[in-house]
Amino acid sequence: MVRATPIHRYRNIGIMAHIDAGKTTTSERILFYAGVCHQMGEVHDGAAVMDWMEQEQERGITITSAATTVFWSGMDKSMPQHRFNIIDTPGHVDFTIEVERSLRVLDGAVFVLCAVGGVQPQSETVWRQANKYFVPRMAFVNKMDRTGANFDKVVEQLKARLGAYPVPMQVPIGAEDGFEGVIDLLKMKAIHWDAASQGTVFEYRDIPIELVDKASKARAFMVEAAAEATEELMDKYLNEGELKEQEILEGLRERTLKVEIIPVFCGSAFKNKGVQAMLDGVIHLLPSPADRPPVQGLDEKGNECRCKASDSEPFSALAFKIMTDPFVGSLTFFRVYSGVLNSGDQVYNSVKLKKERVGRILQMHSNQRDEIKEVRAGDIAAAVGLKDVTTGDTLCDQNHIITLERMIFPEPVISMAVEPKTKSDQEKMGMALGRLAQEDPSFRVKTDEESGQTIISGMGELHLDIIVDRMRREFNVEANVGKPQVAYRETIRKSDVKSDYKHVKQSGGKGQYGHVVIEISPMSDVDKQHPDVKGDFLFINEITGGVIPKEFISPIEKGLRETITSGPLAGFPVVGVKVKLVFGSYHDVDSSEMAFKLAASMAFKQGFAKANPVLLEPIMKVEIVSPEDYLGDIMGDVSRRRGVLQGQDDSLSGKVINAMIPLGEMFGYATSLRSMTQGRATFAMEFDHYEEAPTNIADTVIKKT
């Protein structure tokens, strides 16, 4: 079969933003103008197509990355048809995992910002994630019709707060109630959208006289930014003082793909203004899969290799999301990097080392689905029938094995106990939690060995609320939840602590004998770069002369790794520790793997107790936005919560207070802030780092355990 759309006309893009920037509304307008939806859904009505989960429609926020495909031929239908695979990502900090995994498989992103709120804390988090994957992006300043909208201020914030180099492609005509349209700086024409036709009809007009000077200056800045792309363009610009429209686009595109500049568009998605012009910008300025560097991976022998975005290359794809669909079962969302896959084909999972058959391939449109026969390089689709795939696995041709770079997911910072309300729900709850954990790598489930309780862990209170909510709605499991618990960690402060333990048991017949001598130290910065570091723990074998036979080294390491999952201090995981195995002895008859495993475990527990053990607590980066009247109360409250103020800023929404506050002090903060400020302040927080807990806090936590 011939490819329907050439790969250079593909755009795999994410729509990303801070919560409430109007991201889902922008996505809805894209679907409407591209002819996918024949009526518009509004987030506040709970009718948005991209927000398809019940919780999303109730809460008016986006939780999962909905994927959809649309076609676009330009605002005036003058361009060849382009295929957009769009992923709408959540803006709430508890769901950054969804943003992370989407960015991993996208080629470009549209960063939606609120013209009133500007750059918010979550904007910074998303921006950092996009930088990590070197994703070219452009900005859309939305909500230009809102009271307090200020395009220039937001452009300034992109520079000051995100370190970006914004290049406005448009100048707004008016703002707030007087927002009428935009000036296209390429054509130097004003664009007005017709309200009666919901923005489907538009016209070019002359620039209003009062904005000619502003538009000319903005255009000169844009042309200069384009000219800096190449020496040829710069020479032409210096000699002639101007560039042609096509040359400007080529220069801006080249610099956008190198993530040197951020083209900025503006509009009001809700008022149907500016979205189509932004889509034209996606075609002109964001990359196709062929424009991105070949994706890197490792072949069977562990050598580096690359996948070129071409149908003629062997098949390779990355599974970036697993989802349970009530009608077809488990769905595996994947991005094809090279080659072609037909439904019914066999694929090789190079992470699990297993072959699997793809039953059906579905093109997803939010939660609706169309069955398709094949996918090609650059496509994003969902497969039915894959049983053992998890997020981040590579699917490839079994004759050309490759493992693409895996995704790294954050460790949960909050836990709570959960138990079914009835005996009959016990089994159902286990199955439901297993399914949800398979879908969401930042959500963990474990059973507490002592109490037998089921403990769920995640990225924040909202994250776990929604998990419990989904259990009830999707799996009919009613559950009681305990109070949130902080995910503390344990470590040591003393270096080179020696611990010698001999495990000997003689009870007639074959005995048990294992003897190890270890040295325990905190990991240094150099240690952290060591290739053998696994999960913030480093084991180094320094045994010489066969004092412990080789076959017992692995059980020793295993014994240590099992012990650090529940630290000797208070049962929390141990982090940042290096253990050297320096000496030991064995018995020809009585030594066994189990004996050495036990000896290693006991040696570690004894050594840990002597190495000045300390408890670490998670510290959250908190940003509070409030009217000035309440600053004194808020700062006093931050200090009472053991917070450290990091500084203050002015924003379009009020005063911004930045602070580092222990997570243990933040439970119920939303309610407290609301009552302190009559509901006029907002806050956002994200995990920043672990820090040693003060002695009184550590003592309280240890006593409780």
UniProtKB/Swiss-Prot annotation:
Concerning SUPFAM superfamilies, the annotation shows: EF-G C-terminal domain-like, P-loop containing nucleoside triphosphate hydrolases, Ribosomal protein S5 domain 2-like, Translation proteins
The record places domain tr-type G at 8-290
The GO molecular function terms of this record are: GTP binding; GTPase activity; guanosine tetraphosphate binding; translation elongation factor activity
User: Pfam families this protein is in?
Assistant: EFG_C (PF00679), EFG_III (PF14492), EFG_IV (PF03764), GTP_EFTU (PF00009), GTP_EFTU_D2 (PF03144)
Q: Which InterPro entries has this protein been placed in?
A: EFG_II, EFG_III, EFG_III/V, EFG_IV, EFG_V, EFG_V-like, EFTu-like_2, G_TR_CS
Residues annotated to bind GTP: 17-24, 88-92, 142-145
One GO BP annotation here? ribosome disassembly
Keyword field: Cytoplasm, Elongation factor, GTP-binding, Nucleotide-binding, Protein biosynthesis
Record's Gene Ontology CC terms? Answer: cytoplasm
Q: What PROSITE patterns does its record include?
A: G_TR_1 (PS00301), G_TR_2 (PS51722)
* Predominant location category: cytoplasm
Tell me the PANTHER family matching this sequence.
RIBOSOME-RELEASING FACTOR 2, MITOCHONDRIAL (PTHR43261:SF1), TRANSLATION ELONGATION FACTOR G-RELATED (PTHR43261)
Q: What is this protein called?
A: Elongation factor G
Q: Which organism is it from?
A: Xylella fastidiosa (strain Temecula1 / ATCC 700964)
